[in-house]
Each structure stands twice: as structure tokens, then as C-alpha cells.
């Protein structure tokens, strides 16, 4: 039986959606990397003198989403101390289990992958390991259940990730600007493929559940920008995959998309620097869903 014949319709849809013939893949200028670096360096260097010499401003997709959505919520979240919980841990552990599935030599069973991922995360020396060590039985069972649901859903709706696709999960990516005073960073949920010369071939995928939000697309544009600066060739496509409904929201990367991401980074960094280092008062947002601003506006 052909490998594809053993796949269910959702798995075949993944192959059809993410695949592309070499002749259909875009190619980019060899100068794109240097042009993006220079443009972003110029735009971010103006903030260097506002950042104290002994501090580094780390900017992730999370920070950009916060500051662009609500400046007051950004400040409130920054002042509160992050704590691990079942909702915050299940995504990371799910990604670890999916990563293990690529190289798993035994029969792939979701719960076996989940338990192995939990064991590996608990054996570290970081805050997550400490939290897992002290977890009560009820919370541990809930965590196993939540992660198992995500991993099982992935294995049902995605074809097995072949090694020749060059899958990478939770791969860190970063770029430094303003003599190291500003660092843009993130972790890609899943990347597949690679560029050939200046021809784009990589696909970046972010896994979500729930509703679509415009910030999901902005997250991936941010990753596409960092990937373009790192390699000199953008990803061919970026896609959010919603596990609970087996659907994609994708975008092909063009220079216009990268330019839009670059402008958003500049805008977000400016807002963050002004609030943290210039003393600018954070603005209220107009969203009726913002607990901070909607309550004060009423």
C-alpha cells in the first residue's frame, strides 16, 4: 500500500496544503538579508541611548502582542511574576512529546510520548522542573490529560513527520540590534523543509486551539522576519494550525509581508522603550474585552 493511501483525509490535507513543487517556490534577492538587517538596525538604533547600559531589552512575539493590544495590560503583566500552571505548561510539554514522536522507534502511542516528555522536563534544573516536582496528583493527572489530548489530536490529523522533511520543533531564533541592547527572539513550534540557494522552501507552523485572532498571523510574520535575517532566505509559507478543528490559516511570505513585520517591530519596540525607560504613561485601549481598561472606562 502507498504511504499516502494509509493516511486519513485530514492527514492528506496537511500534505497538500504545505507541499509545493520546486518550480512553484519563490526566490529572493541575495541582498535581502543585508537589506533587512540594515533597515532594522537603523530603525532600532535610535532607541539605544534610552536603554540603560547594563540592561538588555528582550522582545518576543508575546511582548509585541501585549504592547500592541493594550499598553496598560503590558505593564501589569510585566510587574506580575510568571508562575507555571497546567495551562502554561501543557503547550511546551505537548511540543516536546511531538518532537519525540519524530524519532520514536517503538509504536507511537500518545500517552507514552506524554510521559516521556514529562519525565524529561521534570529532570531539568529550571523552574518548570521544580514546579513539576511539587505537582499534586490531581494537577498532574489534569496535565497528562490535556497534553495527551493535544498530542493525540496532532498524531490523528498530521501525517508522520519524515526525517527527510527536516522537522525542527521548538527551535530558538534570535537577532540582536543596537549593539546588543535589543534582542528579538522566539521559538518556532515546527519548521519543515529548507531553502535551496535563494529559493524559499521552509514552512513554519504554529499550533493553536480555539478561535482565530489577527495576532496569530502577526506572530508568524515576526518569525518569518527573524528567519529571513538569520538565513537570508524567508520561509516559503507560514501557517497557524488549529488542532481542535484540523484547519490551517496560512500566508505566503513576500517582501511586502516582511516589511510589514519590520514596521510592527519598530512600532512595538518604540512603545515598550517609551513606557519602560522614558516614563511615558501607558495608554488605555478601546477594547471592550480588556479587563483593565473596560472596567475603568465604565
Named regions from a protein language model:
Residues 1-8, 16-19, 23-29, 48, ...:
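Metal-dependent nuclease catalytic regions and adjoining charged, substrate-binding loops involved
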Residues 1-90:
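C-terminal, charged and often intrinsically disordered regions of DNA end-processing helicases
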Residues 41, 64-65, 173-177, 188, ...:
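Anion-coordinating catalytic cores for phosphoryl-, nucleotidyl-, and glycosidic chemistry
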Residues 70, 94-95, 190, 223, ...:
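A residue-level signal for conserved active-site and pocket-lining positions in enzyme catalytic cores
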Residues 86, 90, 94, 143, ...:
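Hydrophobic (often cysteine-bearing) scaffold residues that line and stabilize catalytic clefts
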Residues 91, 95-102, 224:
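Short, amphipathic alpha-helical segments that act as regulatory/interfacial helices
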Residues 97-172:
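A non-catalytic, helix-rich entry segment at domain boundaries
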Residues 171-263, 267:
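Mg2+/Mn2+-dependent nuclease catalytic core
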